[in-house]
Amino acid sequence: MRLLFIHADEMSFEARQKTKIAEEEPPIKEAEVEDCLVVFAAVQEADEENPKAIAEAAVEEIEDVAGELKADRIVLYPYAHLADDLASPDVAVEVLKRMEGLLKERGYEVVRAPFGWYKAFRLACKGHPLSELSRTVTPEAAEEAEEEKIESEFLVYMDGELIPVEEVDLSELPEDFRHLVMHELGEERETGDEEPAHVKLMREKEICDHEPAADVGHVRWYPKGHVVRRCLAEYVENLMADLGAAVVETPVMYDLSEDAIREHADKFGERQYRIRAGNRALMLRYAACFGAFRLLADTTLSRRHLPLKIYELSQSFRLEQSGEVVGLKRLRAFTMPDLHTVCADMDEAVEEFLEQAKLCLEVGLDLGLEYEVVFRTTEKFLKERKEVLEELAEAMEKAYGDAKPVLVEVLPERKHYWECKVDFAFIDSLGRPIENPTVQIDVESGRRFGITYADESGDERHPVILHCSPTGSLERVICAILEGQYKRFEQEGKLPTLPTWLSPVQARVIPVSEKVLEEAEKVFEELKSEGFRVDLDDRDEPVGRKIRDAGEEWVPYVIVIGEEEVKKGTLSVTIREESTLKEQRREEMTLEELVERLERETEGKPRVPLTIPDRLSRRPRFGR
């Protein structure tokens, strides 16, 4: 935003004619103000990233100048000629209105000239050394100022006690939790340009890669990656069905001239994809909240319907800085499982919050991930409902079989839409957290979006709403699993592998020669008929090469069939989960025993078909 200050003996203006971008209801069409500070303002395109912070930062600048000049009358005058890269009209009006409101709250007499009108004005500058000044407010500086306003306190909850983090010997904490604490305190170790392990793995395993012809942070998924994503998506949707959640689909783009949409976007405070369509400022959603809340506002609800859950697998977008985009950890386009729960009151919300936090822990175990946890809350909520933290810690101990510390961030007052939230993070191979699931108690959106329910007396009330992603984005899930398997290999010497139910290929049949190919095909067809993702290595390659290739692809079960196996009617199966680099775990079993084992490891999980040729002689390699 560009600001031009004129300390004036007199300022008068008259709005004479509308332009096509004029605000519909101008605050005032003409005015004459004496002894005032005139603020000519141009809201710029970059300000659309965080209009709220820009408005607040601009008001700070105005207060600084007004204080020095001892001016208590302010004229806010939209003046597009101060900049070339102007914000959309909707955002500009939003910022100017917010500035007007903030100045009035701080005791100033404010006159705001209408936006988008041709106006005549007369100005008499006082002419002293400070009577003409200018300022530039940038989004970066505005966001930094916003963050500095409310300082949070960090504590560690362990052994039933809350201990200020500065009183804790970090060297005695578990390594992954220590990395989490240092990250939250801004003290994480330097990793330079070192690439996370999963970036190489996602390419090697033909899962996905960045698409060079697209915007940064947008990826293309290869057939194996598509299978993994579908398994994860169906897994979460099945969980939601078990919870009784209604599945919905909503648009990806929203109009920022809608007050509720704009205000909720401001609360997010991070970078957003914004698009202009004529004079309209539109935003690509960064989560499913916008569509979910608009849908709920049009839903007739009573107390007996609550708690009500609605779920969407949302394609979402965040305009991350290009230098911050890393592998699958931070993207500009991602797929987020989003659950929203409408609750009658805070008691019901807390009950649901704990149940959903437990669900996140259970999901992590299904994915082979153990999380470190940050509980974020206001002082008031922690004081009144400390049992929420205690029950969360108990749930972690039950899930992991041992007590784990919890990092607690306490805000002196609420600055977001949530009263409390819990974030679950997996620590990657470089010691950095990958934030995955989250549960939040939202105390603002019910009122903001006009969502109501009829209580037992028939009175309309605004609900408390929970936000929950039981996995985090599908991309980050895959990122965490790959990082976890790399750590498993580096720290324990165990071979990396995906859970069997997620593996693109669950079993591979390898005939040792042409003589046994027919028998190998029978085993292959039987496993395929049972619904498993199985392929047949029918290439004209040495057996050793075939086995090595299966290992490089992390195939959980490799079945080698030779003449001896055909004679005995058994299978020689290499079990990757139980193997190390030094020693392969091979077991002789019947086909029925292998089927039983695969059934156990995939029970209750999605059965997604293989979408590439199931004979390796016909399969291309995807990726660069």
From Swiss-Prot:
One of its GO terms (cellular component) is cytoplasm. Residues 598-624 are annotated as: Disordered. It catalyses: tRNA(Thr) + L-threonine + ATP = L-threonyl-tRNA(Thr) + AMP + diphosphate + H(+). Its cofactor is Zn(2+). GO terms for molecular function: ATP binding; threonine-tRNA ligase activity; tRNA binding; zinc ion binding. Catalyzes the attachment of threonine to tRNA(Thr) in a two-step reaction: L-threonine is first activated by ATP to form Thr-AMP and then transferred to the acceptor end of tRNA(Thr). Also edits incorrectly charged L-seryl-tRNA(Thr). It is an enzyme of class 6 (ligase). Belongs to the class-II aminoacyl-tRNA synthetase family. It comes from the Archaea. This is Threonine--tRNA ligase. Zn(2+) binds at C289, H340, H467. The gene is thrS. One of its GO terms (biological process) is threonyl-tRNA aminoacylation. The keyword tRNA-binding applies. Binds 1 zinc ion per subunit. HAMAP family: Thr_tRNA_synth. PANTHER family: THREONINE--TRNA LIGASE, CHLOROPLASTIC_MITOCHONDRIAL 2, THREONINE-TRNA LIGASE. InterPro entries: aa-tRNA-synt_IIb (IPR002314), aa-tRNA-synth_II (IPR006195), aa-tRNA-synth_II/BPL/LPL (IPR045864), Anticodon-bd (IPR004154), Anticodon-bd_dom_sf (IPR036621), DTD-like_sf (IPR023509), Thr-tRNA-ligase_IIa (IPR002320), Threonyl-tRNA_syn_edit_dom_arc (IPR015011). Its EC number is 6.1.1.3.
